[in-house]
Amino acid sequence: MKQQIETLLNQAIERLKTKGVLKPEVTPVIKITHTTDPQHGDFATNLALTLSKAAGMSPHALAEKIVEALPPSGQITEVEIAGPGFINFFVTEGSYQTVVSSILKAGKDYGRSEMGKGQRVHMEYVSANPTGPLHVGHGRGAAYGACVANLLNAAGFEVHREYYVNDAGRQMGILALSVWVRYLQGYEASIELPKNAYQGEYIIDIAEALKAKYGKQFYHSVESIQAKIPEEIDSNADPEAYLDAWVTAQKDLLGPKDFECVFQAALDSILNDIKNDLEEFGVTYDDWFPESRLVREGLIQEGLDLLTKHGYVYEKNGAQWFRATALGDEKDRVLIRKNGLPTYFAADVAYHLHKFNQGYDQIIDIFGADHHGYIPRIRGFLKGLGKAPEKLHILLVQFAILYRGNEKVSMSTRGGTFVTLRELRHEVGNDAARFFYIMRKPDQHLDFDLELAKSQSNENPVYYIQYAHARICSVFRQLKTTQKNWDRPRGMENLSLLSTNYEKELLATLGRYPEVIKRAAMNYAPHLLAHYLQTLANQFHTYYNAERFLIEDDNLRNARLNLINAVQQIIRNGLTLLGVSAPEEM
């Protein structure tokens, strides 16, 4: 219906151009919204307010001329001007009833569009360091990213989903060291794990698997290790330097081959766990892109060469620096350290250069909110590379805060005292986790209420939505136990019998679904769909409690069954996009 109103408004604008009311070069941006109060009609537009300056008249006067120029329509009963110049449209009941036939005809494809046809989108999300299991904070980024990708796909975009595997940085060296020390403890209990190494039980599990497979192949005595640690490094005064000294000692003692063996065992174990965890959560990827590929394929050097060519690289104190301050950053950034090794920043440059080189129309990075400081530096180096920063959309997600009772649960990957995503999923279920993670705006703090997520009541939004779907399924199961039938074509012929306020509300809400999908996709806002489904479920439950469906009146029964079948389809379609199941029984 919105498209039909937009067409009518465009025709009215063309008529006003012909009459000289508007100049030929005026290009209107027509925005049509559903009204919140039925007394103000079904749809409204602020078109007259946006064009009044170009027309040289008041918004109200222009609104009058637009209304006069509107072509007649059999689906609009009344048009009125409200306030300073809003135009309200009242539509016929028949225009809403046609939505039922559209839904039942399209089925699982209802709401999908070709809005983004021909446009390719690259999405990167989660990309947690493979140094430990995913925790509940990562889960929100996973659920959000997967939902945004689903919504963009439903809107016609071709979406490439990618996980960036940080397999080449300092943290990975610390991970390998942590596993090695736990491995050594299996032979020599006196050795202590450095304070800032990874402490979790999963490290012990990897070490035990290493010991079972390789025996004492990687064993070295405490004395040989201590001999490699410079005496001037104090583990208490500078724990990070002490940790780095241990990593260096490990590499020296093991040699390249054995170190790589320990390193790879740790990486493979944790990365496989992450992959399995996400897959069980319904979050899948088209590609797992390793950071090591950037070096292997010369992408870091390519990025460095391009920045140098554009005059943004200089040398200082033996290191190579990016002149970031010239492009809006607060300080210049090191690209290549004086020891010749690239920084994380250099890897970011190379990875984004790789993304842009693939020719995507949009590139979406989903980061934790603690990465907000990365935004100006990323946009800066994109300018330095000669790439269009406007193609990049950086979406920030606040970490979820888990509460067990009134106690906030702390999370620290190195310390090992964190609640994993898998533990959360096992406690509240995938469906509740997926829904709760996305029912708020991503940049809002989320206090994850475990007790609410597990409750079976109308206070639990995901349960209430799923229960609406299950209730509809129960109506059709009950139908099979009676002598009554469901004649869908006959129901279509009698949709005009759906005249109660409950039915009118449901019909109007069903008609909004395609618009909700488009808005949620274009604004990267799955919470809009979550809120829509809550509204639809609430309206259905009210209808279910007020009316009966398996009645004697054949015409009304078939019309009502068609209506609730359409509600069932929309709930299932919407939940699928959110990664939530639509159970038939509860």
From Swiss-Prot:
Highest taxon, organism lineage: Bacteria
GO CC annotation terms, alphabetical: cytoplasm
Gene Ontology BP terms: arginyl-tRNA aminoacylation
Main location: cytoplasm
Motif ('HIGH' region): 128-138
Cross-referenced InterPro entries: aa-tRNA-synth_I_CS (IPR001412), Arg-tRNA-ligase (IPR001278), Arg-tRNA-synth_N (IPR005148), Arg-tRNA-synth_N_sf (IPR036695), ArgRS_core (IPR035684), DALR_anticod-bd (IPR008909), Rossmann-like_a/b/a_fold (IPR014729), tRNAsynth_Ia_anticodon-bd (IPR009080)
Keywords linked to the UniProt accession: Aminoacyl-tRNA synthetase, ATP-binding, Cytoplasm, Ligase, Nucleotide-binding, Protein biosynthesis
Alphabetical list of Gene3D superfamilies matching this protein: Arginyl tRNA synthetase N-terminal domain, HUPs, Isoleucyl-tRNA Synthetase, Domain 1
Assembly behavior: Monomer.
PANTHER family hit by this protein: ARGININE--TRNA LIGASE, CYTOPLASMIC, ARGINYL-TRNA SYNTHETASE
Family stated for the protein in its record: Belongs to the class-I aminoacyl-tRNA synthetase family.
Entry-linked HAMAP family: Arg_tRNA_synth (MF_00123)
Protein name (Swiss-Prot/TrEMBL): Arginine--tRNA ligase
Lineage: Bacteria, Pseudomonadati, Pseudomonadota, Gammaproteobacteria, Legionellales
